[in-house]
A protein has these predicted regions:
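Terminal, non-catalytic protein-protein interaction segments that mediate quaternary/complex assembly
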Residues: 1-246, 260, 266-315
Length: 315
């Protein structure tokens, strides 16, 4: 099994935090049992993927709920809402702890996108002024943050640039829980890469480079054991890939014909096993973003390692 570019980033980033991260003091989040949720973290993490070259950001070292991640991005940018019941109807259930008491997450995320009509303005800007440098969607609106309580947006800014036939996008995230959401090949990268694919399709471009910048990325203290498990899995994946590429120690063949057949079969198997995951949008070019459905997406060649890992959240 070949590791994806995201897997390689994840291994490097985990090692960096474990070796160089600093522990916070008096953290705001708490675990369900009331214990302060401490983290170790580093600042200014950057990752880059070229979707046009098959570098889709998804981790194979553990299973990612990629379809649910795309459903969440729909509730923010396609059918924007902050109402928990509407989010849950889309299968997005992890926002319940951030209910501000009125069945919403406050004037945040989808509510901000809807209030300022961010998606339609972005698409119009791309179509009318493709090489302009002002194509930005910002969820960080001070008026909204003051209006209601609620979790301040973590992934809050996207910047869009046209490059020939490609549409590139940079996503800025102020804070990221590496192993549950923001890390390489995690939910945040999957869903924003999907958003890039959607906006590119809606404007007639091909999805190009996706860059992810996290100002502060953390590993929670109760996630450290799982961090080491992911490093162990990476070693297993690397060893498996190396073994698949090495020549057989002994080959028994009765003649050239059967040997040639075996070699061809092995090559085909190796080619299949090395195929990397890719998110495919089954929609014709220049379709309206409102016409895209979650079911139009397909993840190909995705075989993550098992068993699934569980992570306790700091709220």
């Amino acid at each position: 099994m070949s590791m994806t570019k995201a897997d390689q980033y994840l291994v490097s980033d985990i090692k960096n935090i474990l070796e160089n991260g600093y522990k916070d003091i008096d953290p705001r989040p708490k675990y369900e049992d009331g214990t302060p949720a401490h983290t170790i973290s580093v600042n200014h993490v950057t990752r880059k993927y070229d979707l046009s070259r098959g570098e889709f950001p998804i981790c194979t070292l553990r299973k990612q709920a990629w379809k649910t991640g795309i459903r969440e991005i729909f509730t923010i940018y396609q059918n924007p809402t902050n109402v928990l019941s509407e989010m849950e109807a889309m299968g997005v259930t992890w926002w319940t702890p951030w209910d501000i008491g009125d069945g919403t997450i406050g004037q945040r995320y989808g509510a901000t996108v809807k209030r300022y009509d961010l998606v339609n303005k972005l698409i119009e800007n791309i179509e009318k002024d493709p090489y302009g440098r002002r194509k930005i969607m910002s969820l960080w609106q001070e008026t909204d943050l003051r209006e209601t309580p609620g979790l301040a947006p973590c992934a809050f800014l996207t910047i869009w640039n046209v490059r020939g036939k490609y549409l590139d996008m940079c996503m800025i995230q102020r804070s990221g829980d590496m192993l549950t959401a923001s890390g390489a090949g995690g939910i945040n990268e999957i869903q924003y890469a999907a958003l890039l694919i959607m906006i590119a399709r809606a404007t007639g471009y091909e999805a190009g480079v996706f860059t992810h910048f996290v100002a502060n990325e953390q590993i929670y203290d109760r996630h450290i054991e799982n961090a080491h498990e992911l490093l162990r899995r990476a070693e297993v994946a690397a060893a498996s890939s190396a073994k698949a590429l090495s020549p057989a120690s002994s080959v028994e063949a009765s003649g050239a014909s059967s040997a040639d057949t075996a070699s061809a079969s092995d090559a085909a198997d190796a080619s299949d096993s090395d195929a990397l995951p890719m998110l495919i949008l089954h929609k014709h070019s220049k379709c309206a973003i409102s016409d895209i459905r979650v079911e139009d997406f397909e993840m190909t060649n995705y075989t993550p390692m098992e068993p699934q890992l569980r992570f306790e959240l700091g709220i």
